[in-house]
Amino acid sequence: MVLQSTRWLALGYFTYFFSYGIFLPFWSVWLKGIGLTPETIGLLLGAGLVARFLGSLLIAPRVSDPSRLISALRVLALLTLLFAVAFWAGAHVAWLMLVMIGFNLFFSPLVPLTDALANTWQKQFPLDYGKVRLWGSVAFVIGSALTGKLVTMFDYRVILALLTLGVASMLLGFLIRPTIQPQGASRQQESTGWSAWLALVRQNWRFLACVCLLQGAHAAYYGFSAIYWQAAGYSASAVGYLWSLGVVAEVIIFALSNKLFRRCSARDMLLISAICGVVRWGIMGATTALPWLIVVQILHCGTFTVCHLAAMRYIAARQGSEVIRLQAVYSAVAMGGSIAIMTVFAGFLYQYLGHGVFWVMALVALPAMFLRPKVVPSC
């Protein structure tokens, strides 16, 4: 079977983020359903996030030949499916730890490699990345809403069934042959050494500290919001809709970002994100009333999207190979490592503080206001 390359790419994003829309909001619910404590759930989720960090940092850069991108996606999707199936094999904590690490290690490089494929194809034929990537966000909304509805109708066991189905669909989509194969010169790996990486961190430590705090503050939300809201009386379906609302707000801001932030610097945008973080996590710890939860979820466009846009703007202002290296550090550390570490702490804090964990997240976001890097122009 052959599929037009743009549609092939859109299908890849759709099936990946459909699966991620099941895994990210509801995996803690599945872990709780099989009898694990919040402390253990935090450890498992944290281990998974560390594996995501390592997968993105170590596996994705290994694919230096653009013509091998599709083969790499197929292999990684197959390995991800094998580990998804392995979740069915047992509920012992040691086994779950092993499977969580393997699943996330191979699941995480799929997006950067798909993005690399999109960049390669943009050089070969006209491709509107935004319109293609949008299907990933749409799929996340569908995945989280559908999972919430089915968990309400049945029970937590439907989560693993849907995840397995989603990953299998992703593999089947990747096995379809696109009309145009990726082509391009093999990218030679730069021999930068530790000194270059350390110099990069020293030069950009304020930026990295700021985004690590802002993204890391999402840990309690990613790991325990579904459990917290269900304990407050909301159905799994309602939880799915709330998560979907956050992604809808995210998509809207992505679509309007050029108009909204045209005159803002990365420093200004990081301030906006930090303020949204303090407000969002403070409200989340204070109340579970539905009107306020709607506000909390709309603020996702500030805590996540504006922070990510600020990071992209800051990185784009760097020169030469520094752009590539700083992008790698940002993706691995801010989007992976900081959330992984904070998720482990969030598990302990939720065990003993309950909703108070979200007030701690507000405190985590607060220092970002003062650590922002000095860049120009200002809005």
Curated annotation (Swiss-Prot):
Major localization listed first in the record, in broad terms: membrane
Keywords for the protein's UniProt record, in alphabetical order: Cell inner membrane, Cell membrane, Membrane, Symport, Transmembrane, Transmembrane helix, Transport
Regions of this protein lying in the Cytoplasmic compartment: 1-4, 67-70, 119-129, 176-207, 257-266, 313-323, 376-379
SUPFAM superfamilies in UniProt: MFS general substrate transporter
Top-rank lineage group of the source organism: Bacteria
Residue ranges that the UniProt entry lists as topological domain Periplasmic: 32-37, 97-100, 153-155, 228-231, 287-289, 352-354
Membrane topology listed for this record: Multi-pass membrane protein
Example of a GO cellular component annotation carried by this entry: plasma membrane
Location of this chain's protein in the cell: Cell inner membrane
Transmembrane feature ranges: 5-31, 38-66, 71-96, 101-118, 130-152, 156-175, 208-227, 232-256, 267-286, 290-312, 324-351, 355-375
GO molecular function: lactose binding; lactose:proton symporter activity
Plastid recorded as keyword: no
Stated family: Belongs to the major facilitator superfamily. Phenyl propionate permease (PPP) (TC 2.A.1.27) family.
Protein purpose: Probable permease involved in the uptake of 3-phenylpropionic acid.
Protein name: Probable 3-phenylpropionic acid transporter
Organism this protein belongs to: Escherichia coli (strain K12)
Taxonomic path: Bacteria, Pseudomonadati, Pseudomonadota, Gammaproteobacteria, Enterobacterales
